[in-house]
From Swiss-Prot:
Source organism (scientific name): Pyrobaculum islandicum (strain DSM 4184 / JCM 9189 / GEO3)
Subunit record text: Part of the 30S ribosomal subunit. Contacts protein S4.
Domain notes per entry: The N-terminal domain interacts with the head of the 30S subunit; the C-terminal domain interacts with the body and contacts protein S4. The interaction surface between S4 and S5 is involved in control of translational fidelity.
Pfam families: Ribosomal_S5 (PF00333), Ribosomal_S5_C (PF03719)
Name of the featured protein: Small ribosomal subunit protein uS5
Domain S5 DRBM positions: 50-113
Gene (UniProt): rps5
Protein role: With S4 and S12 plays an important role in translational accuracy.
Family listed: Belongs to the universal ribosomal protein uS5 family.
Amino acid sequence: MSVVDLSLWEPRTELGRLVKEGKIRTIDEIFANNYIIKEPEIVDILLPGLKQEILNINVVQRQTHAGERSQFQVVVAVGNEDGYVGVGIGKAKQVRQAIEKAVREAKLNLTPVRRGCGSWKCSCDEPHSVPFVVRGKSGSVEVTLIPAPKGVGLVAGDVAKVVLRLAGIKDVWTQTRGDTRTTLNFAMAVYNALRNTYYFKI
């Protein structure tokens, strides 16, 4: 992966300038003020320890005037394992470029995740699960996240486990509907469910 020299970064947005000037110091401030992240460097500065995992690499055909062209399609999840997660997709002729595009999009899609101890079987009050039952949908796939007591672990498919772990969720039950073999829709449905923990009005 290419490394960006943040000292050379010239912000193109007002939010970017505020971050580079040190007027916004935490990622929490961004979401508390309803800012929209349009530059991945903002995430690089405020969440330098962000982890990333490739969920899927596919070869896809693209029709052009010169005929069919092959491209790599990559799905990536990013997260700090402590309440922030993002999912992105990238397409390019080279795998490396597709990964970089996917990581960039995942950073721009970063969302806060509200965690809690929502299971009636557990009363530890620690942020190890989701605080309430929440759903997310993408394409034909619908995912329901159900609070689980401490020690249950992530009762979910492999793709969902990665996204949940990167978000900092340690215990949860899941229910799924639709074609979960479609990695992008499965990952995005989980992402949307996690996003809904933050934006859901209690």
